[in-house]
């Protein structure tokens, strides 16, 4: 009986990380949210305590550069890149929540990329809610918006946030 319970528990614990979820995320979760939660909570806390002005263009570029490296899931090999992407996303989200400037719909979408990226990353850590493909679409649409932002628009946006 002990052996059966041990086998059942082992199968259940290892099997959970490899199942397709109802959300549609089909990749293996190599690094669970519980394994990184404290680090990411610290990133969020550091962002809130940092009063320096952030370069929104540089933050979005960090997400663009890192997204291709993490979009298939987060592994030991790309975990550091994932932290950079998460920090940039957290900073964008913080700016979005704390700006009192009147922003255009395009500028709001740029800042919303932070929250959308963090939402998508929850799936990669096995903690996503909702439909996975919707989260992917939200991030990829946000990335397209960033790619189509002109230098003039970036300069205007930067001026508003200073």
How would you name each of these model-derived features?
Residues 36, 40-51, 105-162:
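C-terminal amphipathic alpha-helix
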Residues 64, 68, 72, 94-95, ...:
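Polar/charged low-complexity regions in secreted precursors and cytosolic/nuclear IDRs
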Residues 17-25, 88, 156, 160:
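Low-complexity, polar/amphipathic intrinsically disordered segments that mediate membrane, lipid-surface
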Residues 12-14, 65, 152:
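Serine/threonine-rich, low-complexity intrinsically disordered segments
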Residues 59-66, 85-92, 110-127:
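Extended low-polarity, hydrophobic cluster-rich segments
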Residues 1-15:
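Sec-dependent bacterial lipoprotein signal peptides
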């Amino acid at each position: 009986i002990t052996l059966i319970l041990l086998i059942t528990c082992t199968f259940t614990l290892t099997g959970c990380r490899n199942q397709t979820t109802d959300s549609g995320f089909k990749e293996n979760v190599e690094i669970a949210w519980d394994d990184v939660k404290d680090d990411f909570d610290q990133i969020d806390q550091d962002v809130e305590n940092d009063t320096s002005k952030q370069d929104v263009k540089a933050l979005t570029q960090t997400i663009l550069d890192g997204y291709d490296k993490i979009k298939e899931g987060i592994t030991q090999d790309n975990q550091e890149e994932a932290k950079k992407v998460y920090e940039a996303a957290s900073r964008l989200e913080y700016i979005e929540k704390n700006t009192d400037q009147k922003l255009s719909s395009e500028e709001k979408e740029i800042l919303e990329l932070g929250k959308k990226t963090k939402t998508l990353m929850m799936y990669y850590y096995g903690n996503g809610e909702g439909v996975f493909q919707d989260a992917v679409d939200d991030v990829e649409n946000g990335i397209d918006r960033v790619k189509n932002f002109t230098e003039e628009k970036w300069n205007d946006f930067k001026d508003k946030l200073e």
